[in-house]
């Protein structure tokens, strides 16, 4: 059952973040916990924003931000991932360039406008 969508099913954890050609450090407390979860119908991207530093346990507070896409589609021949989002109350499919490598265990999602220089790499979780 190797439909284009089936290769994405599961949980992907961020392993690399590049902005404008510069590799950004993944601060273990927050950034490194970002995941992209692909289910049968929906896709969920959960990232964490750095919050305040907590002096009591010497940790950064991480605020979870969840984006839920009710549907998604992967067009392998185009290397595009289509995510359904809502704009002004209407559903809209946005596309992002993606690549799958290393036997479909490494997923790179490119930022639309700075595709070559801004992207995130996720690794499939067992």
Show where each model-derived region lies.
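N-terminal helix-cap/turn-to-beta initiation motif at the start of protein domains
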Residues: 1-13
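A generic structural motif
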Residues: 15, 84-86, 110-112
């Amino acid at each position: 059952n190797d439909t284009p969508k089936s290769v994405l099913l599961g949980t992907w954890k961020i392993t690399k973040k590049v902005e404008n050609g510069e590799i950004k450090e993944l601060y273990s407390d927050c950034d490194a916990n970002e995941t992209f979860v692909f289910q049968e119908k929906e896709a969920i991207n959960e990232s964490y924003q750095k919050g305040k530093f907590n002096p009591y346990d010497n940790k950064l507070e991480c605020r979870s931000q969840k984006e839920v896409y009710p549907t998604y589609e992967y067009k392998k021949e185009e290397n595009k991932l289509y995510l359904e989002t809502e704009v002004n109350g209407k559903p809209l499919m946005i596309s992002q360039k993606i690549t799958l490598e290393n036997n479909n265990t490494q997923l790179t999602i490119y930022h639309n406008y700075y595709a070559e220089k801004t992207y995130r790499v996720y690794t499939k979780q067992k």
